[in-house]
Amino acid sequence: MPTIQQLVRKGRTPKVTKTKAPALKANPQQRGVCTRVYTTTPKKPNSALRKVARVKLSNGTEVTAYIPGEGHNLQEHSMVLVRGGRVKDLPGVRYKIVRGALDTQAVKNRKQARSRYGAKMEKK
């Protein structure tokens, strides 16, 4: 427990929280270009072929981003919008690609949770 005089001299330093998406440089999203689109396998209890893309962001950093939803139209040189948000069973994947923005198409035939996948309302 510091004395009042010690607090007057030094003061208390606030805890610095480390950002979970450092490549975005404190922005909500960042634009980037796909350099490689491929599939990876998840960590131990799960089994699948997860679709990921290596993206070079407009600020110069290169990140691995997950492509959510069923099916995608991404290939090399596609312009994508990247947001934060990790994929728990893919080590090193701390970003997600925004569906329905720039060159990324929305998920087709999506009925629920449409806004997450850029899907428009189905016409009756």
From Swiss-Prot:
It comes from the Bacteria. Residues 1-30 are annotated as: Disordered. Keywords: Ribonucleoprotein, Ribosomal protein, RNA-binding, rRNA-binding, tRNA-binding. Pfam families: Ribosom_S12_S23. Residues 9-18 have a biased composition (Basic residues). GO terms for cellular component: small ribosomal subunit. The keyword Disulfide bond does not apply. GO terms for molecular function: rRNA binding; structural constituent of ribosome; tRNA binding. GO terms for biological process: translation. Signal peptide: none annotated. SUPFAM superfamilies: Nucleic acid-binding proteins (SSF50249). InterPro entries: NA-bd_OB-fold, Ribosomal_uS12, Ribosomal_uS12_bac. Part of the 30S ribosomal subunit. Contacts proteins S8 and S17. May interact with IF1 in the 30S initiation complex. With S4 and S5 plays an important role in translational accuracy. Interacts with and stabilizes bases of the 16S rRNA that are involved in tRNA selection in the A site and with the mRNA backbone. Located at the interface of the 30S and 50S subunits, it traverses the body of the 30S subunit contacting proteins on the other side and probably holding the rRNA structure together. The combined cluster of proteins S8, S12 and S17 appears to hold together the shoulder and platform of the 30S subunit. Belongs to the universal ribosomal protein uS12 family. This is Small ribosomal subunit protein uS12. It comes from Leifsonia xyli subsp. xyli (strain CTCB07).
